[in-house]
Amino acid sequence: MPIVQQGAINTTALIVPDLYVQIVPPQVLLLNGVPTDIIGMVGTASWGPVGEPTIVGNMSDYAANFGPVMPRKYDMGTQVATAVQQGAGNFVCVRVTDGTDTAASLTVLGGVTFTAIYTGSLGNQLSIIFSAGSAASTWRVTIAMPGQTPEVFNNIAGTGAAFWSNLADAVNNGNGPLRGQSQLVVATDLSADTNPIAGIFSFTSGTPGSDGVGTITAASLVGVDTLPRLGMYALRAQGCSLGLLADADDPTQWSTQTAFGLSESIYMILTGPAGDNIANAITVKAEAGVDSYAAKLMFGDWIYWSDQVNAI
């Protein structure tokens, strides 16, 4: 009974009946790790897509996608900022509104209407700058907003209605291999027979945008589980390990959050009201039926936090 290493003999050439043992060396197995540091955040914001999970790594990412921290209840930025200061750096953020959010818009010289690509009050800080283009008899149009890289559309030619048509086409589709479509606004050509003039046109003189937060509740943050999913349910299949609904202190929504955590293997962080006491917290928790490894109910007064963005 020969014992050999695997591959040392040609088994197809063996002609003598016998028992042959081959030693098979151990194989190297590659194990892919599963991240456990992804935090799902749901709350309100002044800019950005609604109901669309967006990856954020730090506060610069957050500001670029959702605008600044806002000093109000249910604000998503406040939750992200406090988590970042404690070392977190991997978020999936979902913006919610009450359905009344609107996008800022501005009509320039009767020739074109610019509308912010997202709803929210941050769009009110947009500005459009007209100046001479690099080529003769052309115009350069710059779209700027605080916290965003200015978008420059150069060498837009034409006069009268032709210019406004060319401008709208450049903004909506790009005007070169290095200048794609705008990520801040969309343009609507009004076919006006007017010519552009140099200057700065601010959205503060147009139709203001709104955040849609006037009637937000904890139920709004929970959202709906039908397509397109909104609120908490937009975190499905996003790989989150932790989940937090900003300031969702309504105990009638805790069991729903817990059930979602169980279904998605997410550890849900539940929020109690500010200024709560032990006796009330125990009673409310029992009435809500929260008793699961998939949820943690935070007790205690809400923290005092130095908001350096709003200086409060």
PLM feature spans:
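A glycine- and small-residue-enriched flexible loop/hinge signal that marks low-structured segments
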Residues: 1-312
